[in-house]
Amino acid sequence: MVARWLRTPEVVRWWGDPEEQEALVTQDLDEPLMRQWIVEHERRPFAYAQAYPAHAWPQPHLAQLPEGSAVIDAFIGEPAMLGQGHGRGFLRRLAKMLLAEGAPVVAIDPALDNHRARRAYAHAGFVGEMVVETEHGPAVLMLFQ
């Protein structure tokens, strides 16, 4: 299912090479610091999310985050579910859960030109417009507190 999602045009556009991403997601199943979820709506899987400690894999644009901060990466894999508001709903719940577990802040870093994701994250409660450079190009650092 995740392999199929990684091949949808919208996911490929932002996540890149499906084979590479599938290998990384599979490899991360054995990584205790990487938490992964399949997100469902009415018992139908539609999205993938992962969360990890911000400083576990050092990235310069996350270096200033407080110790214990969490980072989320996510995508909607079912094209029919895009634009329905489900992304913002599960991201808000996930961010609140990570805060309740002790993270002082939860970060997400959509590509600068991924306007759909940026709107969804803002509706979920993430704030921030700081443009940062990442290994994948310019992104916007958004925080949930």
Locate predicted features.
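Acetyl-CoA-dependent GNAT
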Residues: 23-81, 97
